[in-house]
Regions:
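Generic N-terminal leader/targeting and pre-domain segments
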Residues: 1-31
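Non-heme iron-sulfur electron-transfer modules
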Residues: 1-11, 38-70, 88-117, 420-425
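Cysteine-centered iron-sulfur cluster-binding motifs in ferredoxin-type domains/subunits
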Residues: 19-38, 65-89, 364
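Alpha-helix capping and helix-loop boundary segments enriched in small/acidic/polar residues
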Residues: 23, 42-46, 239-246
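N-terminal glycine-rich anion-binding loops that anchor highly charged ligand groups
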Residues: 29-33, 43-48, 225-230
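Short His/Asp/Glu-rich catalytic/ion-coordination signatures at enzyme active sites or charged loops
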Residues: 60, 80, 84, 243
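Iron-sulfur cluster-binding electron-transfer modules in prokaryotic oxidoreductases
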Residues: 91-156, 164-430
Length: 430
């Protein structure tokens, strides 16, 4: 596809990136076959090919309207199209340029602006998320369903109800408190050469601290010590996907500086239990491509990112007991399957530990969570969740295991079976 970016992005790093992505597209339309929103509406403009045309027109200087913004807003950013594309079109890189560009030229209604600001304000800081959750519980009956279901509730598997064990003065996460069904298999004590940083996160730190606690216990048993890095916090993904790019960069710089200090002190990697955060941090080099002070730093951090399954493949755990509920359905978040490109890896690890992963129809399709998407596009998100839960529960699993905080909260809202993080299941059998 011929493309020449004009206007403010002409002759910029972002403009050159957009042109390269556009030129790789050959209009074949194979992307539409795997696009969740195209499957819902059948509208060409709600599929990747149509959205590519919209962004191309905008970047080449054609008039931009509210309709273009709406169709881009409906994109989940799931990247299923990238996994299916025979030409290797990196659609998300174009979306990350085109969507903020359109947002700068089309003013949103005030209600949308307020909603998007509120989501960013609440979700990027654990203390604010806890405060908002407490206030929300007080007025739960008055809230719309899309918000009511996100509130922490002990009945949803302890969402927001847990607390991370107290940290030591140096930020080390205690590994005490492992499931007490049986003594754990002994492993070598962590050594200084196998220390890794752990992202505490923002929403997850408030709503599901048990995920990181489980990861710390599991990895300690295979000789890897995790330390939550002082100074690191929200990865910036929510801000970025709500087109607050400068805010996202501010959050990312803080993390980069904190993790580089840890790396210089000997940390081997940055372990991230939320696949959405991991995928975004992997894209830090794009975020800082035009920033000479942080471009190399961002590349260094991106190369250090590890999903827990990658660490456990290198340091395999040993089952100490059979699973209490072996029949499981593994939900692979889009950020893990398409973003981190780790399809099938969690299921394979769990199978080696005695679990019985059941087949899941259309595993490439998004559940509808997609970061803030379930709040900004609740109708689409609810339809996609209903389809995903049907697929996940077709073979009667006892539990659904996922790998991302947003997907966990979104699925648990209506799932007929418990939804947990897969690392918790590993914790219980090792």
């Amino acid at each position: 596809m011929h493309a020449t970016v004009k206007g403010p992005l002409a002759d910029t790093v972002a403009g050159a990136t957009a042109e390269a992505v556009l030129r790789a597209c050959v209009h074949c339309g194979m992307c539409n076959a795997v696009c969740p929103t195209f499957q819902l509406t059948g509208d060409e403009l709600d599929g990747p090919r149509g959205r590519i045309y919209l962004m191309k027109a905008a970047l080449e200087g054609e008039a931009i309207g509210r309709e273009s913004q709406l169709h881009l807003d409906r994109c989940l950013g799931c990247r299923a199209c990238e996994s299916a594309c025979p030409s290797g079109v990196e659609y998300h890189r174009l979306l990350d340029i085109g969507r903020p560009f359109v947002d700068e030229h089309v003013r949103r209604p005030w209600r949308e602006r307020l909603t998007r600001w509120a989501i960013r304000w609440v979700s990027t800081d654990p203390s604010r998320f806890r405060l908002a959750s407490a206030l929300g519980r007080a007025v739960r009956p008055l809230l719309p369903a899309s918000l009511r279901g996100k509130l922490p509730s002990p009945s949803r598997g302890g969402v927001g109800g847990g607390r991370l064990p107290a940290e030591s003065a140096d930020g080390r996460i205690p590994t005490a408190g492992a499931p007490s069904q049986a003594p754990s298999t002994p492993y070598p004590l962590p050594s200084a050469g196998r220390g890794m940083s752990l992202l505490a996160g923002c929403v997850q730190a408030a709503a599901a601290p048990q995920f990181n606690a489980a990861a710390a216990r599991v990895l300690a048993r295979v000789g890897v010590e995790l330390t939550e890095t002082p100074g690191a916090g929200c990865c910036g993904a929510v801000s970025f996907h709500l087109d607050a790019v400068d805010e996202a960069r501010t959050l990312a710089r803080r993390n980069i500086d904190a993790w580089l200090a840890e790396a210089d002190a000997g940390a081997d990697a940055v372990v991230i239990t939320a696949s959405g955060c991991a995928a975004f941090i992997k894209d830090y080099p794009d975020l800082f491509a035009a920033d000479p002070a942080y471009a190399d730093k961002a590349r260094r951090i991106a190369a250090m990112v590890r999903d827990p399954v990658e660490v456990l493949e290198a340091h395999p755990p040993v089952a100490a007991r059979p699973p209490a509920e072996p029949r499981i359905a593994v939900h692979e978040p889009c950020t893990q399957r398409h973003g981190l490109k780790l399809p099938g890896r969690v299921g394979a690890l769990l199978a080696r530990l005695g679990f019985e992963p059941q087949p899941v129809r259309d595993p490439h399709l998004c559940c509808g969570s997609a970061g803030p998407y379930s709040l900004t596009q609740p109708t689409f998100a609810a339809a996609l969740r209903a389809n995903k839960i049907t697929a996940l529960t077709e073979h009667a699993p006892a539990v659904i295991l996922t790998a991302n905080i947003g997907c966990w909260m979104h699925l648990a809202q209506t799932s007929p079976v418990p939804v947990r993080h897969w690392i918790e299941a590993v914790d219980e059998v090792t």
